[in-house]
Amino acid sequence: MSTQILATSFKNDNIHKIVRPTTNYHPSIWGDRFLHYDIPKEELNYKQGQVEELKEVVRKEIFGEFLCDDWSNRLKLIDVVQRLGLSYHFESEIQNELQHIYNKISINDSNFEHETLHDASIRFRLLRQHGYRVSLDIFDKFKDENGNFKECLASDTVGLLSLYEASHLSCVGENLLDEALSFTTKHLTEFLENNKKEHPNDDPLSKEISRALERPLRKTLVNLHARYFISIYEKDASHNKVLLQLAKLDFNLLQSMHKKELSEISRWWKELDSAHNFPFARNRIVELYIWILGVYYEPQYSFARNILVKIIALSSIADDIYDSYGIFEEHKLLIEAIDRWDKNCMDKLHPEYLQKYYKILLQSFEEFEQEFEKEETYKVYYGKETFKRLLRGYFEEARWLNEGYMPSLEEHLKVSLVTSGYFMLMACSLVGMKSNNIVTKQVFEWLSKDPKIVRASASVCRYMDDVAGHKNEQERNHIPSTIECYMKQYGVSEEEACDEMNRRVVIAWKEINEEFLKPTEAASPILVRALNLARVMDLLYKNGDNYTQVGKVTKDSVAVLLIDPIP
C-alpha cells in the first residue's frame, strides 16, 4: 500500500519539507523467535559422531563392490541418496558410480536396451545432473512410428513421473524433451483427476505427483525436498533402514546448526537496529536466511552463509532506499559515496539515515576482510565491486523514474539483470567458500564477464520478480518493469507480456542446464550456486512475492527448515 509521508532533507543548511512516496511493508512476523538458540558442544559432537558412524555403514552397503553390475538398482539408490539430501556426504562415490555407468554406455549401449521408461528416465536425469552429455536417443524406444510418445505409456504412471522429472533437464532446442513435458503433464494431471474419485484422501503416489507438478526436482531446494522425501521414503516397505536413520539424524543435526547460525545473524541484525534506523525497509532477516540456506545448506559453508546473509540484508535495505523511500537527490549522494568507498564521505551524506547506512556498509565489509588471511582479501574486493555495481544499477533505475523515462526492453535488461541482485549474490556467494582452491582470482574474473549461467540465473530472478510484483507496483509511483517496457515496445496486453516473461524463464532454465554439461567453464561447486539461486526464485516468487509479503510458502519453509525437527 502506498502512502505519502513528510521527511526532512538537508541542503545548503536549509531544511526543506519533502513528500516521500513510500510503501508500508508489514513488520517481521517472527519477532525475536530466533534470537536465542544454542546447542551444547557435547550434544553437537555426539550427534556428529552418530552421523559419521552411519555414513561408514551406508558407504559400505550402498556403494559396495557387490552392487557393481546392478546398474538399475545402483541408479535408484543414488537417486534416493540425493532426494534424502545426503549426496554431499558421498560426492566422490556417486561420481565414480555415474562415471562407471556412463562408460558402459560409451562401450555398448545395448547394456540398457531392455530398460523400462522409469529406469531410462532416472539414468538420463542423474547423468545430466552431473554434467554428462547423454543423448536423447535414450528415449527412441518409447516413441511410435510417427515420432510421438507411445500412448500405451499413459498407464505407466511411475514411468511418466520419472520422464516428467527428466524433461526438466532439457537444453535449448531439445524439442523431444518439450514434448515429453507436455505428454507427461497431460497424463499425470489426468491420473490425479481420476484418482481423486477412487482415493479421495490421496494415496502416496498422488501426493508425489502433485508435488512434482508444482515443484519438479530440478527446481526444488535440496534440503526442503529432503524433509518431504524422508516422510515418503519412511512409508516405503523396501526402504533401507540405515539410510533412513542417517537422513533423519543428518536433517535434525543440520537444523540445529542452522538455528544457531540464524540466532547469531539475528543478533547482528538487532544490533544494527534496522527497525529504528531504516523503518521504511523490509525487516526480513529470517526470510533472507532461508534464501541463502537455499544457496548452500551444507555445514562446510557456514562461514560463507554468514557473510552472504549479511550482504543480502544490506542490499535489501539499499533496494528499499532506491525503490521506495529515498528521493533522487539522496540517491545521487549515496551512489557518489559508494563509488568512492571512503569514510570521509560520511559528512556529505544527508539525511542521517544515509550516514547510518553508509557507515554500516563500510564497517561490514571491513569486518569481512578481517576474517581472511592477507592473500585472500581479494575475495572481499571482488564482492565489494559487485555490490557497487548493484547500487549503480539501482541509481540508474531511479534516474529513469525521476525523468519519467521508459527504456526499451533491451536497454532495461542491461540494468535490471544487474539490479536483480544475482550477479552480486553469485560473486559474494564465493567470498566465504573454502573449497580446496576452487575459488580463485580466475573464477572471479570469469564472473566479472557475466557468464551465461549467471545471466540465466539472473534472468529467472528478474522475470519472475517482475511478474510476481507487477500488480502491487501499480499502486505507487514505481520504476518501470520488464513487463511495462515489453507492453509499450510491442503494443501487447499485460497478460501477453507476462506470458513472454514466463517463456523467457523457461529458456533461462534450459540455458542453466546446458552450462552444466561437460566440459564446463567452472567447477561444479561454483555452478551449483547459480542453479540454487534460480531455485530460490522458483520457491519464493512462483506464486507471488513471498519475500515482500510473507505468505504460506515462506512460513512453511521456515517451519520445515528451522522450527520442526523430524521425530
From Swiss-Prot:
Q: What class of enzyme is it?
A: lyase
Cofactor binding: number and manner: Binds 3 Mg(2+) or Mn(2+) ions per subunit.
- Which keywords does this Swiss-Prot/TrEMBL entry list? Lyase, Magnesium, Metal-binding
Q: Which InterPro entries match?
A: Isoprenoid_synthase_dom_sf, Terpene_cyclase-like_1_C, Terpene_cyclase_plant_C1, Terpene_synth_N, Terpene_synth_N_sf, Terpene_synthase-like, Terpene_synthase_metal-bd, Terpenoid_cyclase/PrenylTrfase
Indicate which residues the UniProt annotation says bind Mg(2+) 1.
319, 323
Q: Which reaction equations make up its catalytic activity?
A: (2E,6E)-farnesyl diphosphate = alpha-humulene + diphosphate; (2E,6E)-farnesyl diphosphate = (+)-valencene + diphosphate; (2E)-geranyl diphosphate = beta-myrcene + diphosphate; (2E,6E)-farnesyl diphosphate = allo-aromadendrene + diphosphate
Q: What does the entry list as the binding residues for Mg(2+) 3?
A: 465, 473
Residues forming the motif DDXXD motif are: 319-323
GO annotation (BP), single: diterpenoid biosynthetic process
Q: Which residues bind (2E,6E)-farnesyl diphosphate?
A: 282, 319, 323, 462, 465
Its needed co-factors are: Mg(2+); Mn(2+)
The source's domain of life comes to: Eukaryota
Q: Which cysteines are disulphide-bonded? A: none
The molecular function terms in GO held by this entry are: magnesium ion binding; terpene synthase activity
Binding annotation for Mg(2+) 2: 319, 323
Q: Name the pathway.
A: Secondary metabolite biosynthesis; terpenoid biosynthesis
| EC number in record | 4.2.3.-, 4.2.3.104, 4.2.3.15, 4.2.3.73
Matching entries from PANTHER family are given as: (-)-GERMACRENE D SYNTHASE, OS04G0344100 PROTEIN-RELATED
Q: What does this protein do?
A: Involved in sesquiterpene olefins biosynthesis, constituants of cannabinoids and terpenoids-rich resins. Catalyzes mainly the conversion of (2E)-farnesyl diphosphate to allo-aromadendrene, and also produces minor products such as alpha-humulene, valencene and palustrol. Can also use (2E)-geranyl diphosphate as substrate with low efficiency, producing minor amounts of myrcene.
In which family does this protein belong, per the annotation?
A: Belongs to the terpene synthase family. Tpsb subfamily.
- Show the domain comment: The Asp-Asp-Xaa-Xaa-Asp/Glu (DDXXD/E) motif is important for the catalytic activity, presumably through binding to Mg(2+).
Could you tell me what this protein is called?
A: Allo-aromadendrene synthase TPS4FN
Q: Which organism is it from?
A: Cannabis sativa
